[in-house]
Amino acid sequence: MYDRLLGIGDDHWIEDDRGDKAFLVDGKALRLRDTWELKDAQGRVLVGIHRKMFALRDTMVIERAGEPLATVRRKRLSLLRNHYLITLADGTELDVSGKILDREFAVEYDGELLAVVSRRLLTVRDTYGIDIVREDADPALLIALTVCVIHLAEKEREDE
């Protein structure tokens, strides 16, 4: 993923481990709320991402086929500032913690590692990778929640 992933109105390709274009993060400009679509290489929308407008805490919503898939928000009462809670539509909770702004964090389910996000500084472009650990994990969901937690962390930093 490119480091400038989260510019509204910007589009960014996500490449697989072979360097092939696999997903497109399509930033939607001129919207009342921060909005993206994650598309496959053929242009089909896999998930939609938007900021919830009227929430007490900053919240991002991930939808698939118009139905809520997950909500993402900073974890309450956490000693760690960079700790986010993802609640899936079925009530399952995922935990994201680490150095979000440094692009160094992990996604866990019930203490089991699902994915690791880390910087890759040895490339020509400033990029970071999402290493999906579990074979049965949903890549589109993990990419979408990565977009969400980085956006929320950057927004929180701007508001300080």
Label each PLM-derived region with a short phrase.
Residues M1-E160:
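Intrinsically disordered, low-complexity proline/glycine-rich segments
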